[in-house]
Design a protein with these regions (language model features):
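Tandem repeat scaffolds
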Residues: 2-242
Length: 242
């Protein structure tokens, strides 16, 4: 079971605005029973207090399954279908995979540690009290997902897609955010100050509700100017032809 922890609110620069910190899960897993692969995952399966260690779940179908108080360690998740699955009070450590389908899944009180994932589908998913720490995730699809109390810490996100997603109390801590897409996203109490680099491919106009550092503001200046249609030319310089 997870013990809820309350984060300490930080203070954003400018007008003394306070950003509410994300609440992190603190898992306390019960004694676990080793998972015995008797034919693989099953759609709508029920998995309670199990330890999946070095399990090869490649291509398996666990759509709609429920994982409660489980630990997945060193598992292969290539092309695994976990669509609409529920991961509750569960820890995933060192999992790897390409094309894992978690669309419309629910992740609540979950830790994802040192993962190596690519093309993971989480569109339409619900993430609540989730910690993603370490590892690298390429092309993470979070379109129209709902994220509340989510922390990305010491990880690398390459071209994550937050298009149309709703983010509330989301923190990026010592995290590389490369070519992120925020188009049509809604942000509330999103702390981006720990993202380095903070690299946005789209959606700079959706930063309302986020907190950034003065340095990040300078880094984003060219993108913001382009979004506003402002031409930046040194005094005495020649304006480009229109």
């Amino acid at each position: 079971m997870a013990r809820r922890t309350t984060g300490t609110a930080g203070t954003a620069s400018g007008r003394g605005t306070t950003v509410r910190a994300a609440r992190r899960p603190e898992l306390r897993l019960p004694p676990l029973t080793p998972y015995e692969d008797g034919g693989g995952l099953e759609p709508d399966g029920d998995y309670d207090a199990l330890e999946f260690r070095e399990a090869d779940l490649t291509g398996q179908d666990g759509a709609g399954a429920r994982f409660m108080d489980c630990a997945l360690t060193g598992c292969a998740l290539d092309e695994a279908s976990l669509r609409a699955a529920r991961l509750l009070d569960t820890r995933l450590t060192g999992v790897r995979g390409v094309g894992t389908n978690l669309a419309e899944a629910t992740l609540r009180d979950v830790e994802l540690l040192d993962a190596r994932l690519g093309g993971t589908q989480l569109h339409g998913a619900v993430l609540e009290r989730v910690l993603i720490r370490g590892g690298k995730i390429d092309y993470l699809n979070l379109r129209r997902a709902r994220l509340k109390d989510v922390v990305f810490e010491s990880c690398v996100l390459v071209e994550p897609d937050f298009g149309g997603a709703r983010l509330e109390r989301v923190e990026f801590v010592d995290c590389a955010l490369k070519q992120a897409d925020l188009s049509a996203a809604t942000l509330t109490d999103v702390d981006l100050r720990g993202a380095a680099p903070l690299d946005l491919s789209r959606g700079v106009d959706r930063l309302s509700g986020a907190v950034i550092s003065p340095t990040q503001l300078l880094d984003l200046a060219p993108v913001l100017a382009a979004e506003l249609g402002v031409r930046v030319v040194a005094e005495g310089g020649t304006l480009p032809a229109v």
